[in-house]
Amino acid sequence: MDIFSGLLSGFQIVFQPVNFLYCFVGVFIGTLIGVLPGIGPTGAMAMLLPTTFGLSPVSSLIMLAGIFYGAQYGGSTTSILVNIPGEASSIVTCLDGYQMARQGRAGPALGIAAFGSLIGGTFSIFGIMFLALPLAEIAVAFGPPEYFSLICLTMILSVYLSRGSLFKSFIMIITGLILSAVGMDPISGKTRFTFGCGTLIDGIGLVPVAMGLFGVSEVLMNLEESLERIIFKARVKNLLPNLEDWKKSIGPIIRGTFLGFPLGILPGGGAIIASFMSYSLEKRISRNPERFGQGAIEGVAGPETANNAASGGSFIPLLALGIPPNVVMALLMGALIINGITPGPLMIKQYPEVFWGVIASMYLGNIILLLLNLPLIGLWVKLLKVPYRILMPLILLFCLIGSYSLNNNVVEVVIMIIFGMAGYVLRKFEFEAAPLMVAFILGPIWENSWRQSLVMSDGKFSIFLEKPISLVTLALATLLIINSVIKYYRKNKKRFIFE
């Protein structure tokens, strides 16, 4: 199936009433999640995973994907109007977006953020169409050694690009791999780490772990922190940027698109890094860098375009290789696996309706978001006034009901609560949960690839060095580890000398 016939079939799928509805629901929830500070797309997707069990694979993926890129749109609203980022990737939008609002230019700020997001998101969809297919053709030839090496590189990159301590992120990777080993050994059939609990024979469920780490812990953190939200009260008008605004913004939008898309493909990269790098780039090349932080529209246009382009780019390694580059894609991968579909090069051939349905839904979703965001600014502002003491307990109740409804099993509710408390403690001690989740989902594939490789080579580890792709990826992973150790040593050199 060529690209254009595939896209046409995708539009036929997405315009089916049920899929159109789930596309709309996904982007609406995503926008809502982006607008409300403190929840985020990861927590929302984790909480909504149980609702996808009764859906077809294409409907569930359309909805979850809509939540992801919808949250990138919605995050700019609170950054501009409240000076609180609704989504982590919109942090830098606060710097100039809120200043524009204070100057009476909230409308153009919101407008350019929406149009930039549309352009960046649309370009990234073209990128998925034209890159995923040839990459999948190459990946079909991958064997267990190549997949083992790629997963190693993915996990090392998630540590290397983490925002906190590299050592803490490495501990999270190891913890995720250990948790993924709970249950029945796929080769010997013996149980591991179940401690006599029959429920754990099939392993720890993805949904209670995700809901606990990203849903319950988020509720606990937000109940503890009282965010002072000074709502922008002036009337938002003139949402369409004028000609001067477009002249200033067109360059940042183009640069943000071409910067954000490849950063989204990189494991451990994504929308947050893309938005920060875009802002830094625009400030560095500006003739008047002192304007940044004082209401420069370029500081809104570039980052908002970049984070949406990165969001689209992150679908490529998941759909073409079966390797999630970040925790949100890991949750999408989990949703596919739950529906009996293994992401990767064969998925595009075996389930073309899923691949092309999602691609077409992203085109439709980006248009819906533009039409949804700008006219409903007043509604989003009213939602910002809902107190957290009302909102967060409702989210917690939703988590409890969702976890129990999976298998009508109280044990899974207990698992969710345990991981919720663990996630809260981890965040208090500045441990990132994202590397843990990536390792937890990739762990079984990583282990199977490792063991299959050794069976193929009669137990010889040299098989990983005999395959060119495996050798290159392992060499890159090794270089990243060495570089991390050197950076850590230089950073703490004085402390080592004095001790």
Where are these regions (language model features)?
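Short helix-coil transition sites and intra-membrane helix breaks within transmembrane domains
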Residues: 33-42, 80-91, 123-127, 263-272, ...
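A structural-propensity feature for long, helix-poor, extended segments
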Residues: 68-80, 86, 296-321, 325, ...
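Membrane-embedded alpha-helical modules
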Residues: 111-228, 338-493
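Transmembrane alpha-helix interface/packing and boundary motifs in multi-pass membrane proteins
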Residues: 27-41, 71-83, 158-163, 258-267, ...
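Membrane-embedded alpha-helical segments of transport systems
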Residues: 69-74, 115-127, 135, 179, ...
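Re-entrant/interfacial helical elements at transmembrane boundaries that shape
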Residues: 41-51, 64, 79-99, 130, ...
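Membrane-interface alpha-helices at helix entry/exit sites of multi-pass transporters
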Residues: 58-62, 99-116, 287-299, 327-330, ...
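Helix-loop-helix hairpins and the membrane-proximal interhelical loops
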Residues: 1-60, 191-296, 381, 398-404, ...
